[in-house]
Regions:
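Mid-domain Rossmann-like dinucleotide-binding core that forms the NAD(H)/NADP(H) cofactor-binding site
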Residues: 169-240
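Glycine-rich beta-strand-centered segment in the early N-terminal region that forms part
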Residues: 69-87, 99-142
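NAD(P)H dinucleotide-binding glycine-rich loop of Rossmann-like/cofactor-binding domains
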Residues: 104, 108, 121, 137-198
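A short acidic, Gly/Pro-enriched loop at the edge of an enzyme's catalytic core
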Residues: 248-255
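C-terminal hydrophobic helical "lid"/dimerization subdomain
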Residues: 47, 309-363
Length: 363
């Protein structure tokens, strides 16, 4: 082989090596891109969650069960993995768009003002909560009908230890409403008398129990079918509003809790003693009627409060308050649950199961 032949062979070998290297590099790059794409896809998949979403205002039929992006907590928020939520009278109002201006809510929206779950992640400014904590509470702007929701620290408290997550999810909004109406606003004390309208409903069932826990005498109204239920809750006097006018039985009460409004509210002023109070959840008590009888009045607007939730949990664990769960449905059946809520004749609460109950016994 001549010198020129050896040069040609060497050049060919170098060219072959270069071509092989380029092919290997291309294969390596393709492999890296494929791995990265799979990793990103998996990461994106992890950031998705199941939720019930409304893209329009309207009836329960606007709700859709779909995949949405999992929220990331801000520095003053905690991410909660939701085990259960429940249905409230506020949900149809939210879906109707009633709160859009007052609360600044925007579409699409996820309903759900009750949650019970486990803290998954905390923001830098969260000091009380930590990952793994079992909590229950009331997210101010909803979002509970999903696998994850962000909450402020003051919107949740430690879950009552004696309750399952499904039971705990039936508590926050309705129990807070009853507590802030009777304890914070009306200052119910031992041996006072309280009239609770709609005593078998979500708020009413808690109101009867809270008033009894405070040592009050309780008169409650409900339909014929719920008379025994009122007694089970602890009501001293049960009135069947379909047969008897409540003002024929209730006299000189210290406080009235009204979740009905209209005629029921208008007739309630006459049964309250001088200096007593009428608390309405749906309307502003008539100032002229109050002044004429020397009464106090309040229109109730519930808000999340860790202290109140903690006190409610204490009474629950002491056996003085018990949530009434009438039905547990999977999250995918939220439309069915919402239709039941719109009837306003549900006894206690309907719960939405979002995940299985954790097996840890200390939660």
């Amino acid at each position: 082989m001549t010198a020129s032949d050896r040069v040609v062979c060497a050049c060919r070998d170098k060219l072959l090596i270069m071509q092989t290297s380029r092919c290997l590099l291309a294969i390596l790059n393709l492999t890296i891109l494929t791995v990265l794409s799979c990793y990103v896809a998996r990461a994106d998949e992890k950031r998705l969650m199941k939720a019930v979403v409304a893209h329009d205002y309207g009836a329960p039929d606007v709700l859709k069960f779909e995949n949405v992006t999992q929220p990331e907590p801000k520095e003053d928020e905690a991410l909660v993995r939701v085990i259960a939520s429940s249905v409230n009278p506020a949900d149809p109002l939210t879906l109707s768009g009633k709160y859009a201006k007052e609360w600044g809510t925007h579409l699409p929206l996820i309903p759900g003002y009750d949650i019970a779950g486990i803290v998954e992640k905390t923001g830098a400014k969260i000091t009380r909560l930590k990952k793994g904590d079992a909590v229950y509470g009331y997210p101010t702007f909803g979002g509970g009908w999903a696998e994850f929701v962000n909450v402020k620290e003051w919107e949740v408290a430690a879950k009552p230890k004696s309750l399952t997550f499904a039971e705990a999810a039936a508590v926050p909004l309705c129990a807070l409403t009853a507590w802030q109406s009777l304890v914070t606003t009306a200052h119910i004390q031992d041996r006072q008398t309280v009239l609770v309208h709609g005593g078998s409903g979500g708020v009413g069932s808690f109101a009867v129990q809270i008033a009894k826990a405070r040592g009050a005498r309780v008169i409650a109204t409900a339909s014929t079918a719920n008379q025994d239920f009122l007694k089970q809750l602890g009501a001293d006097v049960a009135i069947d509003y379909t047969k008897t006018k409540f003002e024929e039985v209730a006299k000189d009460v210290d406080a009235v809790l009204d979740p009905v409004g209209k005629e029921t509210l208008a007739r309630s002023y006459d049964v309250v003693k001088k200096g007593g109070i009428v608390v309405s959840l749906v309307a502003r008590p008539d100032v002229a009627e109050l002044e004429k009888r020397a009464l106090h009045g309040a229109s109730m607007w519930v808000h999340p409060n860790t202290g109140d939730l903690t006190e409610i949990a204490r009474l629950i664990d002491a056996g003085k308050i018990k949530p009434i769960v009438t039905q547990v449905l999977p999250l995918s059946e939220a439309i069915t649950a919402e239709r039941q809520a719109e009837t306003h004749h549900t006894r206690g609460k309907v719960v939405l199961r979002i995940a299985d109950e954790p097996k840890r016994s200390n939660l």
